[in-house]
Amino acid sequence: MPVITLPDGSKREFAHPVSTLDVAADIGPGLAKACIAGRVNGELKDACDLIETDAELSIITAKDEEGIEILRHSCAHLLGHAIKQLWPQTKMAIGPVIDNGFYYDIDLEHKLTQDDIEALEKRMLELAKTNYDVVKRVVSWQEARDTFAARGEEYKIAILDENISKDATPALYHHEEYTDMCRGPHVPNMRFCQHFKLMSIAGAYWRGNSENKMLQRIYGTAWADKKALSTYLARLEEAAKRDHRKIGKQLDLYHMQEEAPGMVFWHNDGWSIFLELERFIRRKLNQYTYQEVKGPLMMDRVLWERSGHWDKYSEAMFTTSSENREYAIKPMNCPGHVQIFNQGLKSYRDLPLRMAEFGCCHRNEPSGSLHGLMRVRGFTQDDAHIFCTEDQVQAEVSSCIQMVYDTYSTFGFENIVVKLSTRPEKRIGDDAMWDRAEEALKQALRANNIEFTILPGEGAFYGPKIEFTLHDCLDRAWQCGTVQLDYALPSRLGATYVAEDNSRQTPVMIHRAILGSLERFLGILIEEYAGRFPTWLAPMQVVVMNITDKQADYVEEVVKFFKEQGIRASFDLRNEKIGFKIREHTLRRVPYLLVVGDQEMENKEVAVRTRDGVDLGKMRIEDFAAKIHQQISLRSLKLLEE
């Protein structure tokens, strides 16, 4: 007689084995109707799976994050069901859940079109609206193989042969005449899978191996109700409007071309923003007492072998040779910084030593993964490495955390998710060292009143790590900042200092990045601001326009004054209507549009309006310059009078 303990501590006793669905029905018909699956003693189970002994049970519904993930997985099976009805010759590969949706890789000679996708979506909805039950059968390995062999499903057979033990009992999920294989769980009925949309088609190699056949990958999204789906699609539409590639072209910030894949050609205005970001971080480095250094772009293979990168990372490194020596273009800055540390004898009195670089790095990312500024091959990293004693770790990490939050808040990012990755199974050092390292990171986070999630076993083999993920205005997550302890690299590269007792000791190395890749962070900012940069970042802060030729000399005089004040200003003296000029510079997202007519010229004033169309009236040029200077020095995210 199993006794079921529910999350509120209440218990229910049954005279026979029961399923999660049975328990839900015993509680009430509403919960039975909403039940998708169950978490039994911490493990997700199908709603139909029997519970034979005493257990703790949480009933999963579409209100739970796990419930949404399950219905998305079931939508992938629904997609398979529809595909096999429309194209019976299709061979099904894999159909996992991804962020906000799912995909299915299929082998079909017919190249799917947008019309086909619409037909597929229509058939999926027709099937889902019949509210058929999903039937689960647990079978032997051989029966599963025979089932898929009879259907000609060679990819399912390959999964069984290569990934599943012959002693296993795979679960088959029957969607009427369609059968799929999965660990589950899945929804018990297709009434849960009626709010979805197929999004796109792409190519994908089987097993991710370019030597295998190219399959077609169909992406979809699925949600618990119509409102959630509509909200997500509206967010995607807004994201498309904010696409940094589109805005980058509109504002003439940068371009990329086939002859240099993953490399950025910065144009004047884009480079202006890039340099402003650098200047901002450089001020932070000075505030937090860092040295700024510059290491070579390319170093001998021997050094990369000593650091361990050649063995672990060589596939992502660009290499070249000269005079019988092999070189690698650096993918990261850390080995170079250790070389700088090693020049000259270091004492414990020199520590902590904080070393920063705007390092130009290159990584040989797969061409298919490149995406505008977000995924490139050549990038600048706001990298820093702190050499310190073990006793100094907590204070230094705390300082890094403060710098991260100080920096992100300047750009308007307040929603930061923090994760602490702890010791993996394969690691250097003893448990005592890891205990101290992990506790130092925890204490630093707690000292700054930061909530964090622990990711057990996700740390690097050489030390634990803190990751900072910022959420933008569309609630998309961007992992940017990291603070990583390293107990291995200084030792591998011979870094030592003289301790207080005159012994030679190896320093702890803290890897620290805040923006990460400046290119990627600039892409994030373009999308966050939709190209409407705050005044301090805007490549052109002010444009001054005349109404007639009579004001041309005065306009040039005003612009000259602004430039002398350090304000990025330009003029527009074209023989065009003032409304046309205002519209054009509004589309260029220039923060302030200044208009000069006869009256303004006579009174040494300018008529000020913002790119949002707010009329700020007439101001003396000295007064306007003072207001702008204050806004820039405060790095305000708002325009005047907002």
Swiss-Prot record:
<dbReference type="InterPro" id="IPR036621">
    <property type="entry name" value="Anticodon-bd_dom_sf"/>
</dbReference>
<dbReference type="InterPro" id="IPR002314">
    <property type="entry name" value="aa-tRNA-synt_IIb"/>
</dbReference>
<keyword id="KW-0547">Nucleotide-binding</keyword>
<feature type="region of interest" description="Catalytic">
    <location>
        <begin position="243"/>
        <end position="534"/>
    </location>
</feature>
<keyword id="KW-0067">ATP-binding</keyword>
<keyword id="KW-0030">Aminoacyl-tRNA synthetase</keyword>
<dbReference type="InterPro" id="IPR012675">
    <property type="entry name" value="Beta-grasp_dom_sf"/>
</dbReference>
<dbReference type="GO" id="GO:0004829">
    <property type="term" value="F:threonine-tRNA ligase activity"/>
</dbReference>
<dbReference type="GO" id="GO:0046872">
    <property type="term" value="F:metal ion binding"/>
</dbReference>
<protein>
    <recommendedName>
        <fullName>Threonine--tRNA ligase</fullName>
        <ecNumber>6.1.1.3</ecNumber>
    </recommendedName>
</protein>
<comment type="function">
    <text>Catalyzes the attachment of threonine to tRNA(Thr) in a two-step reaction: L-threonine is first activated by ATP to form Thr-AMP and then transferred to the acceptor end of tRNA(Thr). Also edits incorrectly charged L-seryl-tRNA(Thr).</text>
</comment>
<keyword id="KW-0479">Metal-binding</keyword>
<dbReference type="InterPro" id="IPR047246">
    <property type="entry name" value="ThrRS_anticodon"/>
</dbReference>
<dbReference type="GO" id="GO:0005829">
    <property type="term" value="C:cytosol"/>
</dbReference>
<keyword id="KW-0963">Cytoplasm</keyword>
<feature type="binding site">
    <location>
        <position position="334"/>
    </location>
    <ligand>
        <name>Zn(2+)</name>
    </ligand>
</feature>
<dbReference type="InterPro" id="IPR002320">
    <property type="entry name" value="Thr-tRNA-ligase_IIa"/>
</dbReference>
<dbReference type="InterPro" id="IPR004095">
    <property type="entry name" value="TGS"/>
</dbReference>
<dbReference type="InterPro" id="IPR006195">
    <property type="entry name" value="aa-tRNA-synth_II"/>
</dbReference>
<dbReference type="Pfam" id="PF07973">
    <property type="entry name" value="tRNA_SAD"/>
</dbReference>
<dbReference type="GO" id="GO:0005524">
    <property type="term" value="F:ATP binding"/>
</dbReference>
<dbReference type="InterPro" id="IPR012947">
    <property type="entry name" value="tRNA_SAD"/>
</dbReference>
<dbReference type="InterPro" id="IPR012676">
    <property type="entry name" value="TGS-like"/>
</dbReference>
<keyword id="KW-0694">RNA-binding</keyword>
<comment type="subunit">
    <text>Homodimer.</text>
</comment>
<dbReference type="GO" id="GO:0006435">
    <property type="term" value="P:threonyl-tRNA aminoacylation"/>
</dbReference>
<dbReference type="InterPro" id="IPR033728">
    <property type="entry name" value="ThrRS_core"/>
</dbReference>
<feature type="domain" description="TGS">
    <location>
        <begin position="1"/>
        <end position="61"/>
    </location>
</feature>
<keyword id="KW-0436">Ligase</keyword>
<dbReference type="InterPro" id="IPR004154">
    <property type="entry name" value="Anticodon-bd"/>
</dbReference>
<dbReference type="InterPro" id="IPR018163">
    <property type="entry name" value="Thr/Ala-tRNA-synth_IIc_edit"/>
</dbReference>
<dbReference type="InterPro" id="IPR045864">
    <property type="entry name" value="aa-tRNA-synth_II/BPL/LPL"/>
</dbReference>
<dbReference type="GO" id="GO:0000049">
    <property type="term" value="F:tRNA binding"/>
</dbReference>
<comment type="similarity">
    <text>Belongs to the class-II aminoacyl-tRNA synthetase family.</text>
</comment>
<keyword id="KW-0862">Zinc</keyword>
<keyword id="KW-0820">tRNA-binding</keyword>
<dbReference type="Pfam" id="PF03129">
    <property type="entry name" value="HGTP_anticodon"/>
</dbReference>
<feature type="binding site">
    <location>
        <position position="511"/>
    </location>
    <ligand>
        <name>Zn(2+)</name>
    </ligand>
</feature>
<dbReference type="Pfam" id="PF00587">
    <property type="entry name" value="tRNA-synt_2b"/>
</dbReference>
<feature type="binding site">
    <location>
        <position position="385"/>
    </location>
    <ligand>
        <name>Zn(2+)</name>
    </ligand>
</feature>
<dbReference type="Pfam" id="PF02824">
    <property type="entry name" value="TGS"/>
</dbReference>
<keyword id="KW-0648">Protein biosynthesis</keyword>
